[in-house]
Regions:
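Carbohydrate-associated surface elements
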Residues: 5
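A conserved nucleotide-sugar
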Residues: 34, 38-79, 160-164
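Short glycine/serine-rich donor-binding loops of glycosyltransferases
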Residues: 87, 107-110, 130
Length: 192
């Protein structure tokens, strides 16, 4: 399988101190399973109250998801950012990126996050996109769909173990070269 090349507009990896923020990006629809992310964040937040969750995206579940954040007691720690032209800059400096999709091909948000070196947690979802590029525990973390505890534990593991998180981020950056326009172009040319 030949993947699509990474957009040249994706910012370079960030090497500074990461913000105490978990980020996720995607339409506010059932497929993206933001409910799982909010529930996992609530569990994580009970042990890490100085962290916030930023959700980027718009959709029909906006009101329901805000209600869930309130129900879980984290409304003040969850921000719904909607559409943002600088979403990549926000993700790039975050502590962790999470994608909890129920089904997904190769998510651009996931690939961008990995290529920027952000420690990334994704679900093993139908479509297998995350499993095509993430080696669990090596360049990211995979969890089962709706396994809220596993996702919360993965968040905690990454923020509590900065050396591990840094190592995962460094290995994830290797995708940047693998997805460069030049590398992908060479793969296509070799087929012709």
């Amino acid at each position: 399988m030949i993947l699509n090349p990474l957009s040249e507009s994706v910012p370079e990896p960030y090497d500074g101190e990461r913000r105490k923020v978990i980020t996720t990006s995607g339409r506010l629809e059932e497929q993206k399973n933001h409910e799982m992310t909010i529930r996992a964040f609530a569990r994580f937040h009970s042990l890490h109250p100085d962290y916030r969750l930023e959700i980027f995206g718009e959709g029909s579940l906006d009101v329901r998801l805000r209600g869930l954040a309130a129900e879980e007691g984290v409304a003040d720690a969850v921000s719904f950012e909607g559409f943002s032209p600088n979403v990549l800059d926000c993700i790039r400096t975050s502590a962790v990126f999470v994608m909890s999709s129920r089904f997904e091909g190769l998510s651009n948000s996931m690939l961008e996050s990995l290529c920027m070196g952000v420690p990334t947690i994704c679900t093993r979802c139908m479509g297998g996109g995350a499993e095509a590029v993430i080696v669990d525990g090596a360049n990211g973390i995979l969890v089962d769909i709706d396994d809220v505890e596993a996702e919360a534990n993965a968040m905690a593991h990454l923020v509590d173990n900065s050396e591990y998180a840094k190592a995962i981020g460094l290995r994830a950056r290797e995708l940047r070269q693998q997805l460069s326009l030049e590398t992908i172009g060479d793969k296509w040319l070799s087929l012709l």
